[in-house]
Amino acid sequence: MENYTAPEWSRSALITIDTQCDTLDGQPFEIAGTTAILPRMKSLLAAFRSTGRPIIHIVRIYRADGSNVDLCRKELVQKGARLVLAGSPGCQLAPDLLPHDEILLDEGLLLSHGIQTIGDNEVVIYKPRWGAFYNTPLEQYLGKLEISTLVFCGCNFPNCPRTSIYEASERDFRVVLADDAVSGLYDQGRVEMRNIGVELLSASQVSAAVRR
């Protein structure tokens, strides 16, 4: 019998979520555990780059006037909180994620829902809300590449990774969560992911599978 949720590694892509400078230790929007997962995220990126598999970095970018900010954070930003603000260093991808130095986000392109290429088969997409698929070109991009399997890693499982995984599941993607390369993961979250067919693997297990 076919396992409909088993990863198809030859048709897989890696998705990093919101791993931007402001989320790292000591920064204005610090998310506990995000700096600690960077080495394992780097290992995943190395595996996907070495095999030519697609990589998509999903980011948040807030305008300083708060015009594109979620309602739950709008007042915070309008009062001067510096959270992944357009034009700020904190908005940039964490340096450990970059394929080479001196890459800066093209905020104009991204905010207009364009796709920024930063390497071979490696792009950045802006998402305006929690989910990576909501009002973004992600699904169309993955469809053109005939991707069936998505590997998720990155910042703050309860919010954006979790939402993005549910969105991927409802679009019938096979989903893998690199459970030691995502911050904020908790025991009940693991149970809930398995309950919807998500495969939980370590970064080293994913890397080995991609390289086979």
Give, region by region, the residue ranges found by the protein language model.
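Short Gly/Thr/Asp-enriched flexible loops that form oxyanion-binding sites at enzyme active sites
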Residues: P161-R171
